[in-house]
């Protein structure tokens, strides 16, 4: 059922495939078809890095107090270590779907889709938890639900994380994708940081972080890349623990903490199914022909139109046959 949404991520020399990903993927495809692989004479050995990873987290994360946490692993890979780790960093941990099951019997492990957070919301409200954390299928993304059971979209928790970094390191650079709220950019600037908007996609975010030596990066899908105090890759468990660390220094509830970053009237990602050829034609025609007065056009990835109090966005998905849209305004 989920096969169309699965895939393989390639990295070259610790980087994503970057702006020339299409050419690089086609070259890899050709090598695979020709069975052209390098053959070494080394030895293969099995090693576990579980304890080394846990030790690294223990070294990097310091909590002033422990919170009551609900963790939804979505039956994904985060089920292996997630409960053990979050239990150590929580006053009380309520586990949801923390057994690996690739058929995903409870919900699809995509925290960017609000319907996949319904069980987490119910559990947070039932147990009166401080925060709910959802991991995606491979554990590199996260979704957040506050103490009132409200979904906190990634650009809002990126705002909190950005503020935390900028309180310690002024003029740090923060990378985010074109789907993020203007509130994030304003938060970064308010706290004397340097906002960098880039294309949507793991490879593009990672490339911009490396090019600009940015302290933090993230996108609306829930990928968070900590380059300050971590290793610059997207890690849902570390990002979740970092959130707990930030919240542990607050006397306010999680809901009150996020109220500092107002939730504008906005949509989640809206996906319109189409075919791969047509989606790029639509974007090309819009860029060339749709130029409404009073709006600033940003075309680094699809088309983003920014007005004085609102913006709208459309792009062609790189990974699925669909168009992706999002809208935001100060009023409804």
PLM region spans:
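Single conserved hydrophobic/aromatic residue that forms the stacking wall/gate
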Residues: 1-21
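General beta-strand structural signal in soluble alpha/beta enzymes
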Residues: 71, 95-96, 134-135, 152-154, ...
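Acidic, glycine-rich loop-and-beta core segments that form the ion-binding/anion-interacting portion
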Residues: 114-190
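Gly/Ser/Thr-rich active-site loops/lids in small-molecule metabolic enzymes
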Residues: 22, 95-97, 150-169, 202, ...
């Amino acid at each position: 059922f989920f096969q169309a949404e699965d895939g393989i991520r390639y990295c070259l020399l610790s980087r994503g495939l970057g702006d020339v990903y299409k050419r690089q993927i086609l070259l890899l495809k050709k090598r695979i078809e020709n069975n052209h692989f390098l053959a070494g004479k080394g030895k293969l050995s099995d090693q576990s890095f579980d304890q080394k990873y846990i030790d690294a987290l223990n070294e990097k994360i310091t909590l002033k107090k422990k919170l009551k946490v609900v963790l939804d692993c979505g039956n994904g890979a985060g089920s292996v270590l997630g409960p053990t780790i979050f239990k150590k960093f929580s006053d009380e941990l309520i586990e949801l779907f923390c057994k690996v099951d690739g058929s995903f019997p409870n919900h699809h492990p995509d925290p960017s889709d609000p319907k996949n957070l319904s069980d987490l919301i119910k559990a947070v409200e039932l147990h009166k938890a401080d925060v709910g954390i959802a991991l995606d299928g491979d554990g590199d993304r996260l979704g957040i639900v506050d103490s009132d059971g409200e979904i906190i979209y990634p650009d809002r928790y990126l705002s909190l994380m950005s503020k935390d970094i900028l309180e310690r390191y002024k003029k740090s650079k923060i990378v985010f994708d074109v789907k993020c709220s203007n509130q994030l950019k304003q938060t970064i600037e308010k706290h004397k940081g340097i906002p960098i908007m880039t294309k949507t996609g793991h490879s593009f975010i990672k490339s911009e972080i490396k090019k600009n030596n940015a302290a933090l990066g993230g996108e609306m899908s829930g990928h968070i890349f900590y380059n300050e105090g971590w290793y610059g890759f997207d890690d849902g468990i570390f990002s979740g623990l970092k959130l707990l660390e930030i919240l542990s220094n607050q006397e306010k509830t999680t809901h009150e903490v996020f109220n500092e970053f107002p939730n504008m009237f906005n949509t989640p990602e809206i996906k319109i199914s189409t075919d791969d050829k047509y989606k790029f034609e639509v974007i090309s025609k819009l860029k060339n022909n749709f130029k409404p007065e009073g709006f600033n056009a940003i075309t680094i990835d699809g088309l983003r139109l920014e007005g004085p109090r609102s913006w709208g966005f459309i792009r062609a998905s790189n990974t699925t046959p669909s168009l992706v849209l999002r809208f935001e305004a100060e009023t409804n």
